[in-house]
C-alpha cells in the first residue's frame, strides 16, 4: 500500500516536524594541510575592519599595531571595529543601574576563586601553544615545560601550586633580560642496515639549550598559535582558530571567571548554562515580552546574526569594561584582571606551518615555513596568495603577524556576552524614552532581539536604534543574515522556539551509535545517549526502543559479537560459540561475549555487568572482573567516566556514563611510530607526569581530598600522609608491627634522598 506522506503530519503540530528536516547525515568536512592561508585571511580582514584607526609601534617588540578605538563613526552599513569608549562605559553603567550590586558581588566571588585556584587548572584543555618548543602540545605538557623553564631561570613563586603565584612568575619573566630554554631537535643520519644491507635513515633525539633575548621571549609569550577549525558544517571555506600559550591562559581564566559570574546573574545571557536550564531561562524573557504586548502592542523577534563578531571586538574595549567593573576593588585584583586584555592588545598570530610546494616535473616537495614569507620572492605564489602575503608583510616578525585589534575565536566568550547584554539592557522604556522598547537573548556572538511597539513604524524605529547602538560598541548586526518574525517563532543557538522551545531530536543523531573506545565503554555510552534523549529531547518510548535495537545490532556488527546461537560467521564466531556452549546460564553472558541483550527502555540506567551479575556463571564472573588478567592493561576506573559526544551542531559535549571495570575495559596501545620521532621525549615527560598525578591521587582519594593549601611539595604531602595512615592502621590493628616499621623506614629513606638531591 502506498502511504501519502502528508498523512503522517495530520496529527503532528507543525513545530514537531522539525526533526524531519535534518540535513547533516554523513561526516562533517575536515581540513587538511596548512592553515597559514586562513590565518592570513583573519589577520588581513581584522585590519581591514579597523583600517581607519591609528597606527603605533610597540616599543618592546617593534610590532606595528592598529588601534581603532574611538575611531570615526560609521557612515554606511559595512562592518567596522570602531568602538567608542564612552559608549561602552555608559552601557556598563546602565547595566549596573538595572542590576544593583552585580559587579561588586561578582568581583567578590572572583577574588575568592583567584586566591584558591591551583595551577593545575591550566592542565585542562587540549592543544596548547608551547612557547618552549614553538608548537602545539597537550595542555599538561605545555604547562610542565613552562614551569620547568621558569624554575631553571630562577622563577620559583609557582612552587606554592597556586595559579596566582604562577602568574607572578609570568609577570617577572617578562622583565628578564633573557630566558634560557631547552629545545628538542632531531638528528638524521644515513647508515647501512646490517641485515638488509640497504641504507636507512636513523633518527636520534637531542636536547639543546637556547637563550632567548627579551624581545624574542615577549614575542613568544604573546603568541597565539593558529589551526584550522575542523568539522564545521554548512560552510564552503574553512577558518582559523587560535590557541594561546601558558602565559596568557591563566589571566584569561580569571577574566572569564569574573564575566561568567556576571552572566549567571543576567537573565538575557545564554551562557554559562546549557540544555534545559538555558531553555527555561530564555523562555522567561520571551514570556515577559509577550505578556506585555498582548493588548495594544505589536511584538516582533529578530533571529540575529552578527558579522565577524570577534574580528570587530577589541581587547582595549575589554580593558575599559574591566576597569569599570572592578573600579572599587583592591589594586592587586584590578591589575591581575587587566593583564589579559593588555596582552591581547599586543598579541601576535603565529602563521602556522607555512606553504607546501610541489614541482611536478622534478617530483620534489618543499615546505616554505611561515618565517620565510617575509622575504621570499612572490613569483612562486598564485594571485590570491600573493595579495595576502603582500598585505600581511608589514606586520610580520619572526613568522608571526602582529594582530592588535580583534579577539580570535573563543577567547572571551563570557565577557563579550556581557557587552552584548548591556546593549539589550538599554531597550527598557526608561532608557528609550519613546513608545518602542526591546529585550532579547545573547550568547557569545549569537542573539535574538524582541522588539515591542504600538505599530510597524515603531518596530522599524526600534530595530534601527538597536542597530546603531550596537555599532557604537563594535557589534555589527548583519542585515543580510538576520530575519524578523512575529514573536513566537525564532531560532537562538540552534534552539528553535515556537510557542516554547521545540525539541529537535535530530540534532542528536550523530551521537547515536558505537563510539569505538572499547566494548565496555561503548555499551555504556550507547544506552546512556538513548536514556538522555528520552529525558531531554522528546525521544518517545517506541522510537527509543527501536533506537536501542538498532544500537545493539550496530554494536554486534562492530565488535563481531553476534549471539552464540546465531548463524552469522565472523572471525570471532568460533570462540564465542565455544563460550556459549560451555556456559550454563547463557543470559549472564555480556552482549560483547555473544550473550543476549537484556536492555529495554526501563533499565537503561543500569550498567550491563550489574544488570546480568546475578545471572552469570561463577567462573565467568571470576574471569570478567579479574584485575590480574594479564591481557588487559587497566585504566584506573572511576565510578563515572566522561565521554565526548558529537551533536550535529555546536561543540562536542561531555557526557557522563557509568563505568564498571571489567576485562572488556581495555585501552589500545599507543601507535609505535611516535616513539621514533622528536615527540618521544615529550611522550615520556607526559607519562611521568601522569604517573606522578596517579600516585598522588592514590594517597589522597577523592573522598578525603582537600586540596593542600600549604607550601609543601607533592612528595612531602604524600610522605606525611603515608605516616598518618600507617599510624592509624597500626593502632587499629589493621597492619602488623613489622609492616608499620617498614613503612616508616621507606618514608625516612625518601626524605633522605630528597635532602641529598
UniProtKB/Swiss-Prot annotation:
Chain spans, region Disordered: 50-82
Short motif (Nuclear localization signal): ranges: 187-195, 203-216
Primary location class: host cell
Entry keyword Ligase: no
Pfam family of the protein (one): Flu_PB1
GO biological process: DNA-templated transcription; symbiont-mediated suppression of host gene expression; symbiont-mediated suppression of host mRNA transcription via inhibition of RNA polymerase II activity; viral RNA genome replication; viral transcription
Post-translational modification: Phosphorylated by host PRKCA.
Domain of life: Viruses
PROSITE patterns reported in the protein's UniProt record: RDRP_SSRNA_NEG_SEG
Keywords associated with the record: Eukaryotic host gene expression shutoff by virus, Eukaryotic host transcription shutoff by virus, Host cytoplasm, Host gene expression shutoff by virus, Host nucleus, Host-virus interaction, Inhibition of host RNA polymerase II by virus, Nucleotide-binding, Nucleotidyltransferase, Phosphoprotein, RNA-directed RNA polymerase, Transferase, Viral RNA replication, Viral transcription
GO MF term list: nucleotide binding; RNA binding; RNA-directed RNA polymerase activity
InterPro entries: RNA-dir_pol_NSvirus, RNA_pol_PB1_influenza
Residues in RdRp catalytic domain copies: 286-483
Reaction(s) catalysed (UniProt annotation): RNA(n) + a ribonucleoside 5'-triphosphate = RNA(n+1) + diphosphate
Entry function: RNA-dependent RNA polymerase which is responsible for replication and transcription of virus RNA segments. The transcription of viral mRNAs occurs by a unique mechanism called cap-snatching. 5' methylated caps of cellular mRNAs are cleaved after 10-13 nucleotides by PA. In turn, these short capped RNAs are used as primers by PB1 for transcription of viral mRNAs. During virus replication, PB1 initiates RNA synthesis and copy vRNA into complementary RNA (cRNA) which in turn serves as a template for the production of more vRNAs.
Assembly and interaction partners: Influenza RNA polymerase is composed of three subunits: PB1, PB2 and PA. Interacts (via N-terminus) with PA (via C-terminus). Interacts (via C-terminus) with PB2 (via N-terminus); this interaction is essential for transcription initiation.
Protein name: RNA-directed RNA polymerase catalytic subunit
Protein source organism: Influenza A virus (strain A/Gull/Maryland/704/1977 H13N6)
Amino acid at each position: 500500500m502506498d502511504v501519502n506522506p502528508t498523512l503522517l503530519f495530520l496529527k503532528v503540530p507543525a513545530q514537531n516536524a522539525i526533526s524531519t528536516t535534518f540535513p547533516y547525515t554523513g561526516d562533517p568536512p575536515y581540513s587538511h594541510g596548512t592553515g597559514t592561508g586562513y590565518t592570513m585571511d583573519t589577520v588581513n580582514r581584522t585590519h581591514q575592519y579597523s583600517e581607519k584607526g591609528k597606527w603605533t609601534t610597540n616599543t618592546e617588540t617593534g610590532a606595528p599595531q592598529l588601534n581603532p578605538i574611538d575611531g570615526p563613526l560609521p557612515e554606511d552599513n559595512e562592518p567596522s571595529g570602531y568602538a567608542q569608549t564612552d559608549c561602552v562605559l555608559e552601557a556598563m553603567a546602565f547595566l549596573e543601574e538595572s542590576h544593583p550590586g552585580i559587579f561588586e558581588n561578582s568581583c567578590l566571588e572572583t577574588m575568592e576563586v583567584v586566591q584558591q585556584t591551583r595551577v593545575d587548572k591550566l592542565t585542562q584543555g587540549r592543544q596548547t601553544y608551547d612557547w618552549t618548543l614553538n608548537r602545539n602540545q597537550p595542555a599538561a605538557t605545555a604547562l610542565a615545560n613552562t614551569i620547568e623553564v621558569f624554575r631553571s631561570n630562577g622563577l620559583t613563586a609557582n612552587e606554592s601550586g597556586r595559579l596566582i603565584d604562577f602568574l607572578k612568575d609570568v609577570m617577572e619573566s617578562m622583565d628578564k633580560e633573557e630566558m634560557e630554554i631547552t629545545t628538542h631537535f632531531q638528528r638524521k643520519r644515513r647508515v647501512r642496515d646490517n641485515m638488509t644491507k640497504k641504507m636507512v635513515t636513523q633518527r636520534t633525539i637531542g636536547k639543546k639549550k637556547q637563550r632567548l633575548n627579551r624581545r624574542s621571549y615577549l614575542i613568544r609569550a604573546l603568541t597565539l598559535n593558529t589551526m584550522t577549525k575542523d568539522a564545521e558544517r554548512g560552510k564552503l571555506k574553512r577558518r582559523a582558530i587560535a590557541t594561546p600559550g601558558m602565559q596568557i591562559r591563566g589571566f584569561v581564566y580569571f577574566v572569564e571567571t569574573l564575566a561568567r559570574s556576571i552572566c549567571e546573574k543576567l537573565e538575557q545571557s545564554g551562557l554559562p548554562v546549557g540544555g534545559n536550564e538555558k531553555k527555561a531561562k530564555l523562555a522567561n524573557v520571551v514570556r515577559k515580552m509577550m505578556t506585555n504586548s498582548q493588548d495594544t502592542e505589536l511584538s516582533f523577534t529578530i533571529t540575529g546574526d552578527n558579522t565577524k563578531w570577534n574580528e570587530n571586538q577589541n581587547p582595549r574595549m575589554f580593558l575599559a569594561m574591566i576597569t569599570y567593573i572592578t573600579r572599587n576593588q583592591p589594586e592587586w585584583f584590578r591589575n591581575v584582571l587587566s593583564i589579559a586584555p593588555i596582552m591581547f592588545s599586543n598579541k601576535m598570530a603565529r602563521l602556522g606551518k607555512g606553504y607546501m610546494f610541489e614541482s611536478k616535473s622534478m617530483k620534489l616537495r618543499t615546505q616554505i615555513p611561515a618565517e620565510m614569507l617575509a622575504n621570499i620572492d612572490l613569483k612562486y605564489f598564485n594571485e590570491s596568495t600573493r595579495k595576502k602575503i603582500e598585505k600581511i608583510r608589514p606586520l610580520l616578525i619572526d613568522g608571526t603577524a602582529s594582530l592588535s585589534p580583534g579577539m580570535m575565536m573563543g577567547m572571551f566568550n563570557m565577557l563579550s556576552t556581557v557587552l552584548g547584554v548591556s546593549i539589550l539592557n538599554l531597550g527598557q522604556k526608561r532608557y528609550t524614552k519613546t513608545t518602542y522598547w526591546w529585550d532579547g537573548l545573547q550568547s557569545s556572538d549569537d542573539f535574538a532581539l524582541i522588539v515591542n511597539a504600538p505599530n510597524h513604524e515603531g518596530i522599524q524605529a526600534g530595530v534601527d536604534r538597536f542597530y546603531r547602538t550596537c555599532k557604537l560598541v563594535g557589534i555589527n548586526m548583519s542585515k543580510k543574515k538576520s530575519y524578523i518574525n512575529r514573536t513566537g517563532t525564532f531560532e537562538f543557538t540552534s534552539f528553535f522556539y515556537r510557542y516554547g522551545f521545540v525539541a529537535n531530536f535530530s540534532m542528536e543523531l550523530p551521537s547515536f551509535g558505537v563510539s569505538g573506545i572499547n566494548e565496555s565503554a561503548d555499551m555504556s555510552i550507547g544506552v546512556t545517549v538513548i536514556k538522555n534523549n528520552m529525558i531531554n529531547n522528546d525521544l518517545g518510548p517506541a522510537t527509543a526502543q527501536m533506537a536501542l535495537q538498532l544500537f545493539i545490532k550496530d554494536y554486534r556488527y562492530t565488535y563481531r559479537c553476534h549471539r552464540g546461537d546465531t548463524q552469522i560467521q565472523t572471525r570471532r564466531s568460533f570462540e564465542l560459540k565455544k563460550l556459549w556452549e560451555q556456559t550454563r546460564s547463557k543470559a549472564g553472558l555480556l552482549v560483547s561475549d555473544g550473550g543476549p541483550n537484556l536492555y529495554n527502555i526501563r533499565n537503561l540506567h543500569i550498567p550491563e555487568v550489574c544488570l546480568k551479575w546475578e545471572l552469570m556463571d561463577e567462573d565467568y564472573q571470576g574471569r570478567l572482573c579479574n584485575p590480574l588478567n594479564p591481557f588487559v592493561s587497566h585504566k584506573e576506573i572511576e565510578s563515572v567516566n566522561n565521554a565526548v559526544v558529537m551533536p550535529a551542531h555546536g561543540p562536542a559535549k561531555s557526557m557522563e556514563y557509568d563505568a564498571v571495570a571489567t576485562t572488556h575495559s581495555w585501552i589500545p596501545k599507543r601507535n609505535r611510530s611516535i616513539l621514533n620521532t622528536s615527540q618521544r621525549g615529550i611522550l615520556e615527560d607526559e607519562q611521568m607526569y601522569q604517573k606522578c598525578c596517579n600516585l598522588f591521587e592514590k594517597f589522597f582519594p577523592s573522598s578525603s581530598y582537600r586540596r593542600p593549601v600549604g607550601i609543601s611539595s607533592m612528595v612531602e604531602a604524600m610522605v606525611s600522609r603515608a605516616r598518618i595512615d600507617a599510624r592509624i592502621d597500626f593502632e587499629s590493628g589493621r597492619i602488623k608491627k613489622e609492616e608499620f616499621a617498614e613503612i616508616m623506614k621507606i618514608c625516612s629513606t625518601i626524605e633522605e634522598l630528597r635532602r641529598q638531591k
